[in-house]
Swiss-Prot record:
SUPFAM superfamilies with a match to the protein in the record: Glucocorticoid receptor-like (DNA-binding domain), N-terminal domain of MutM-like DNA repair proteins, S13-like H2TH domain
Name the record gives this protein: Formamidopyrimidine-DNA glycosylase
InterPro entries found in the cross-reference section: DNA_glyclase/AP_lyase_DNA-bd, DNA_glyclase_Znf_dom_DNA_BS, Formamido-pyr_DNA_Glyclase, FPG_cat, MutM-like_N-ter, Ribosomal_uS13-like_H2TH, Znf_DNA_glyclase/AP_lyase, Znf_FPG/IleRS
Protein family per UniProt: Belongs to the FPG family.
FPG-type zinc finger span: 241-275
Keyword Metal-binding included in the entry's annotation: yes
Function as written in the Swiss-Prot or TrEMBL entry: Involved in base excision repair of DNA damaged by oxidation or by mutagenic agents. Acts as a DNA glycosylase that recognizes and removes damaged bases. Has a preference for oxidized purines, such as 7,8-dihydro-8-oxoguanine (8-oxoG). Has AP (apurinic/apyrimidinic) lyase activity and introduces nicks in the DNA strand. Cleaves the DNA backbone by beta-delta elimination to generate a single-strand break at the site of the removed base with both 3'- and 5'-phosphates.
Protein EC: 3.2.2.23, 4.2.99.18
Gene it is expressed from: mutM
Residues holding DNA: 94, 113, 156
């Protein structure tokens, strides 16, 4: 699933192309992709709308702001792609929506797993949408402070890996960047959140910011499905220390990376650097 760095990269790559363009028509091959409003209303409302200069993101949601106070809200889920391209580019097999633009180009939404969803809503309602209104702070915002992190760790008696995946705690983290942050902070993924020391919490806070920033710098992580809004792969997969590296040597100590299940999710870690305690 695209996480914060991937979604941020998509937003930035689309922003430079979509600004000022108008949607002239829509091809909708999978109506179930549209969450709200009703499909016929969605099509009627979005045709003729112009993309604003500044697009946005909240957690893993893309926010494509449009004229007349509307925003196209998109969650890519596991395998969604949103690509700006030439109209004559061969169609991907799992293309579900095509937005035709007034410069002759297209914005295409494709999704192999078919879990991705989009909604067209008044911009003022975006902060109140289910899935967004409950979100915690963005990891690169000042609201995600060391003090916030330490306070939340004390009051949530759950495994730290599970907590990092909770979007109500911090927005945008997923399996990849949670594992990388825990490794950087030398914290075992099964440690209980309130058991972390003040020093460990500070180290985790720093690690989260560093891995997210690095993920954005390298334009996200590509294994199979993820590409940005121009169809380009990311490169953060070449920077990974533990994620998806089971059996390979830890770059810090040389011990083999291990994989365990935490809350039903695969977690990669180094048993030497990240002690269970």
């Amino acid at each position: 699933m695209p996480e914060l760095p991937e979604v941020e990269t998509i937003v930035r790559s689309l922003e430079k192309h979509l600004s000022g363009l108008v949607i002239t028509s829509v091809d909708l091959f999978k109506p179930e992709v549209i969450r709200t409003p009703r499909v016929d209303i969605f099509t009627d409302q979005i045709v003729g709308r112009q993309f604003q200069k500044k697009l946005g993101r909240r957690g893993k949601y893309l926010l494509l702001h449009m004229s007349d106070g509307l925003t196209l809200v998109i969650h890519l889920r596991m395998t969604g792609r949103l690509i700006y391209c030439d109209a004559d580019l061969p169609l991907e097999k799992h293309t579900h929506v095509i937005f035709h633009l007034d410069n002759g180009k297209q914005l295409r939404f494709a999704d192999v797993r078919r879990f991705g969803r989009m909604s067209l809503v008044p911009t003022r309602e975006v902060p109140h949408l289910p899935g967004i209104k409950e979100m915690g702070p963005e990891p690169l915002d000042t609201a995600f402070s060391r003090e916030y992190l330490k306070k939340e760790l004390r009051r949530r008696r759950t495994r730290i890996k599970s907590l990092l995946l909770d979007q109500c705690f911090v927005a945008g983290l997923g399996n990849i960047y949670a594992d990388e942050a825990l490794h950087e902070a030398k914290i075992h993924p099964e440690r209980l959140a309130p058991d972390l020391t003040s020093r460990e919490a500070s180290g985790l806070h720093k690690a989260i910011i560093e891995v997210i920033s690095s993920g954005i710098k390298h334009r996200g992580t590509t294994f199979r499905d993820y590409v940005d809004g121009e169809g380009r792969s990311g490169s953060y997969q070449h920077q990974l220390k533990v994620y998806n590296r089971e059996g390979l040597p830890c770059p810090h100590c040389g011990k083999p990376i291990q994989r365990i299940k935490v809350a039903g999710r695969s977690s990669y870690y180094c048993s030497s650097c990240q002690k269970a305690k």
